UniProtKB/Swiss-Prot annotation:
Single Gene Ontology BP annotation: nuclear-transcribed mRNA poly(A) tail shortening
GO CC, any one term: CCR4-NOT core complex
Name this polypeptide is given: Uncharacterized protein C23H4.16c
Length: 328
């Protein structure tokens, strides 16, 4: 926990007193997520200053562009309305955070002026960082309404207030609101339960072009238990999605092709995992009458192709598919 007593301690001392985790990447990442959560849930405006600094402190030996939380720093800096925090983030992003090591969070908050912020902002290579983050698929290719939510939701669980603000929004989403593929995966990982409800909301409040591209992203998402859980929920709630036309082929067709490709283009160990999860997913789809009929008739050859490459994990499913085909 971040203590109020640190608010009058220099940033350099805070770094030493906090004792950064060992050089274990997972441990550092988890500590950083905890710090972000504390910052988000604190009513004390100085706590986010300490949190952001400590996240940087954990990764101070890592080149800026390779810090896992660069997207968090960058997006928070762009949207931050609290001058001291924006100033500190600008120093991090411009590689000048060492200039603040001798001051305390309280001193920083008390002394920063709007002109200081403007000058610090001018030293940030915003376009270069934006381009880098886009290339790494850590931010969408354009600034959009959902940008901060995709980024925040990929790093932590969204707060109840954030979740409700999205569900209560009357915005009609367009292509500029699409997430990058890796953001979509991270968002589901951090917000599994909410993703199910939110993605349905998106599909019901978006233009046709957004829906086409968003469904293609979902159809090609990597096979994990969490990801297929979301896909299953969407198809259970909106059975018509299975036959939603995407470039002349149905959503479920694209999904089967993706599953086939993921099974065939991976290592032996990964093939076993993907085959097991994907087979279970398809078996669950057969519990939905309309999808069972669609899979065993229109998509029979595509499903058969998947079952063949996913053997032996798909053996029972394959027998079931052939039986349905022969006895409709």
């Amino acid at each position: 926990m971040l203590g109020k007593e640190w608010e009058n301690t220099s940033f350099a001392e805070i770094g030493l007193l906090h004792q950064a985790p060992n050089d274990n990447d997972l441990e550092k990442f988890q500590h950083a997520l905890t710090l972000m959560s504390e910052a988000d849930n604190s009513s004390d405006l100085l706590i986010p200053l300490i949190s952001d600094f400590l996240i940087w402190f954990y990764y101070q030996k890592t080149p800026l562009k390779w810090i896992p939380f660069l997207g968090h720093f960058f997006n928070t800096w762009q949207s931050c309305s609290f001058p001291p925090r924006r100033y500190l983030l600008a120093k991090i992003l411009s590689g000048r955070i060492s200039e603040l090591l001798k001051v305390s969070p309280f001193e920083l908050a008390a002394s920063v002026t709007s002109q200081d912020v403007v000058e610090a902002d001018s030293l940030v290579e915003e376009n270069e960082l934006q381009a880098w983050l886009e290339k790494q698929e850590l931010v969408p290719s354009s600034s959009n309404f959902l940008n901060s939510f995709w980024i925040s939701g990929g790093e932590r669980e969204l707060t109840e207030e954030e979740q409700n603000s999205l569900l209560q929004s009357n915005t009609t989403y367009t292509n500029s609101d699409l997430p990058a593929s890796k953001q979509l995966e991270s968002f589901i990982s951090m917000n599994l339960s909410y993703s199910k409800v939110f993605f349905l909301h998106l599909l019901q409040h978006s233009d046709s072009s957004f829906n086409d591209k968003f469904l293609l992203l979902l159809a090609n998402i990597p096979v994990t238990v969490s990801n297929v859980e979301v896909l299953l929920y969407l198809l259970q709630q909106e059975e018509s999605l299975a036959q939603f036309d995407l470039n002349g082929k149905s959503f479920l067709y694209h999904m089967l092709v993706s599953l086939h490709n993921q099974v065939t283009n991976t290592s032996h160990l990964e093939k076993q995992r993907i085959s097991t999860v994907a087979t279970l997913f398809i078996s669950k789809l057969f519990e939905i009458p309309s999808l069972s009929e669609y899979l065993s008739s229109t998509l029979f050859l595509d499903l058969q192709a998947f079952c063949i490459v996913a053997l032996p994990q798909s053996a029972k499913l394959f027998q079931k598919v052939k039986a349905l085909k022969n006895n409709p």
